[in-house]
Regions:
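Long, basic/Gly/Ser/Thr-rich N-terminal segments
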Residues: 1-86
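Switch II of P-loop NTPase G domains
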Residues: 174-231, 239-246
């Protein structure tokens, strides 16, 4: 996708519905109150329209005379920041099974990248604060608790709800995933940015979205994976029986208790099948998209990989003035850690490794250990036991049926909360930095030897 002489891209790809259109078809949201209805978004939503009048500053004027600054896709009418008319998009899709810790990991990844990327000579900021509001709330929950003794727990990614938008098209309701958008620019050595930036577009996938029948024309919630420039597969060792047996005798971490959950190989197989289907590929074709396999909860199983802390994945090089330094990713360290993680999967889950390497280009697969929290979950003190009331079947009131049908607690052992003061992510910035290195290496050049 190239830029035209007026610094606009030839095509914009909507991050919501993936419709491609020229910049002059970008719609604007009306601001006049009489237009508080949109036939795609529904009642209470300001109408998206193609403007014919503009202010000298380039803002649209709606038919009621309102000045309009917010822009939308001409097809789905969802938000499309004007930035996407100038900056090419780097799309990153993350997927994994329920309980793999994706919610924590996404919050930790975005938070640590925003904190660390400046040391690499790159700036990062929200491309649209409204679109990123969910992730920002997760970050606040994880990293901005008032007390170090506060307990932290995040809601999982649901296959409906706040993580998705609903629109009306052709008399049918369609569900679309919400993207998270970040503007990234190089700046080191310049007083201002080079304006050769990118828009990083991050998608999350609920594990339930890979169940049979979850993906269809009215619910195309995983279709963005076929458009992704990089895929992040969260492979959770704590869900695998072989890993659990290897760790249970050596670790008191509560994440090794209970039964193994899910079938991560089946989920990976289904995700790969969908990508091939969406791209009209043959079942035997290899997917050429870079794949980063993330092994989360590293703090719980690190003794399987190393007896020491992970090394710093970068080199610091002084700048010419000598007053400061800039970081360069140390690809030798990344590849060495990737090799060790690969061997670990080969030892404990060889069938999955064979599936991964048979599906993707082996030269574009990287394995990374990460920990969103850097610590184990804690167990809360149990509440005082209450007198159990068992309704009599002889005079059972219909309202008492709720007592009999109540679902068991999802976390019967009381684990799953984290102490805020113990949270210290490990390599959480590396998935997105590695994705950026693979797709746009000019942002993270190699250090000169």
């Amino acid at each position: 996708m190239t830029s035209s002489p007026n610094n606009l891209l030839e095509k914009i790809r909507c991050p919501n519905c993936w419709h491609e259109f020229p910049p002059d078809q970008l719609h604007f949201y009306s601001t006049s109150p009489e237009f508080a209805f949109d036939h795609v978004l529904g009642a209470g939503q300001q109408r998206a329209f193609l403007p014919s009048q503009f202010t000298p500053q380039g803002d649209a004027i709606d038919p009621g005379g309102g000045i309009c600054t917010e822009t939308a896709c001409p097809k789905c009418h969802l938000r499309v920041p004007r930035l996407l008319a100038q900056f090419p998009t780097i799309a990153v899709s993350i997927f994994g099974s329920p309980g793999s810790g994706k919610s924590f990991l996404i919050a930790a990844m975005t938070h640590t990248v925003m904190q660390q990327i400046v040391h690499y000579g790159v700036t990062a900021e929200d491309a649209d604060p409204l679109l990123n509001a969910i992730v920002r709330d997760y970050e606040k929950t994880l990293f901005q608790q008032a007390s170090p003794d506060a307990t932290v727990q995040l809601r999982k990614t649901e296959d409906v709800g706040d993580w998705y938008n609903k629109i009306q098209q052709r008399g049918r309701t369609k569900t679309l995933p919400k993207p998270f958008l970040y503007r990234i620019d190089r700046f080191w050595g310049n007083k201002t940015a080079t304006h050769e930036g990118r828009c990083l577009c991050l998608y999350d996938n609920a594990g339930e979205s890979f169940e049979p029948g979850a993906e269809n024309e009215d619910n195309p919630v995983t279709r963005h994976m076929a458009k992704a420039d990089t895929l992040l597969f969260v492979y959770d060792p704590t869900q695998e029986t072989a890993f659990r047996r290897a760790c249970a005798e050596k670790s008191s971490d509560p994440q090794w208790r209970g039964q193994a959950r899910g079938d991560q190989t089946a989920l990976f197989t289904e995700a790969s099948k969908r990508i091939r289907d969406f791209r009209s590929m043959r079942p035997t074709d290899k997917i050429d998209t870079p794949l980063i396999v993330l092994l989360p909860k590293f703090d719980a199983w690190k003794f399987l990989l190393t007896d020491e802390d992970l090394p710093k994945p970068y080199k610091e090089v002084p700048v010419e003035s000598g007053a400061s330094s800039i970081r360069f990713l140390d690809t030798d360290i990344l590849l060495d850690i990737s090799r060790k993680c690969r061997l670990l999967i080969k030892k404990y889950q060889p069938a999955l490794l064979a599936k991964i390497e048979a599906t993707f280009n082996i030269k574009k697969i990287i394995f990374l250990p990460v920990s969103a929290t850097g610590c184990s979950p804690v167990k809360e003190s149990p509440p005082e036991p209450e007198q159990e009331v068992v309704p009599s079947l002889d005079n059972l009131d219909l309202g008492d049926l709720d007592l009999l049908s109540e679902d068991p607690p999802s976390n019967p052992d009381g684990y799953g909360h984290f102490r805020a003061g113990d949270i210290n992510p490990i390599w959480a910035e590396m998935p997105l930095l590695t994705a950026l290195k693979l797709v746009a290496p000019q942002f993270l050049p190699r250090a000169k030897k």
